[in-house]
Amino acid sequence: MSKNMEYRKHRIEYLRTTVEYSLFGGEGGTREAHLMFHVDPEAGSYEEQLTAIRKAYHRILSRKVKIRGMVPVFCRYFLSDAANQWEALQAVLQKEPSCAVSVVQQPPLDGSKIALWVYLTSEPNAAYKHYWTAGAGVSCGKSERQMKTLLKSYEADLVGKG
């Protein structure tokens, strides 16, 4: 099966939001998509920009034929001031379907207060399964020891999952 790649850009004017997306896969196989949501920097407060991003996210997932039926594997939020923005984001995320979420204290280059990167897939593959984890770390010892401890922890988690 040959893999198809498609790159698109979609503007949602009333939300002042742009979505760039890349689609991978083809007929009869697992499809993948990477979506990057940007909001205009002058589109209001952080809360207003967060609302616009979330509305754009739901609109794209429900209306774009090639994305319909795909499920999010992870969402990565880029925030301009994570310490002060996390609480509002957390309140929104509690109302959303579950997927791995990461938050990066890195202001979007365009000057907005928030951007969102989403990875989606159409169906699980019977040959393998993705496991996503976040926040793991070992704070004591030298870097080699930290790495070994962390890898042993991952190994134990995988053994526990069968």
State the predicted function of each range.
Residues 1-162:
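Short, polar/acidic, helix-capping and beta-turn segments at strand->helix junctions
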